[in-house]
Amino acid sequence: MKYALIDTANTFFRARHVVRGDLDTKVGMAFHITLNSLKKIWHEFDADHIVFCLEGRSWRKDFYEPYKRNRQEFRDALTPSQQEEEKVFWETFDAFKEFVTTKTNCTVLQHSQLEADDLIAGWIQLHPEDEHVIVSTDGDFAQLISPKVSQYNGVSTVSYTHLTLPTSRSV
């Protein structure tokens, strides 16, 4: 079995930075890149099943207070129009999440204390004999790449395998 493991928020939110333009264009591009990434994985990598991994609050914050603290500072510094864009993107993402949860046969994983990368790593551990394609721009996934695990960056359309490991700046 070959699983496509989607770092869903990463894929969706990174895609909006690919194009300049109005909010509708950015939202449309986020959908386009996310869905095209899935189509490419399905066809080129011959995936059998898609697993959407969704964000929860990280357990790491309970042990290391500064963990991702700069993200809140970044959000606090947004202009009103950027705040509106952020709000619309989260609303759109929630609608996408609802769609894949209720209208597809894809697996959807979410836990209140785990980030998507935790869920992806856990899924791979639970299915060691299967093949996995991680869809994400996150360079931290390089540590999971092996003969049975590869990574596809849906924004740059670059794939990494155990034979072509990414550098820290290339993902």
Language-model regions, residue ranges each:
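Noncatalytic, basic helical substrate-engagement surface that gates or grips nucleic-acid strands
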Residues: 2-133, 141-158
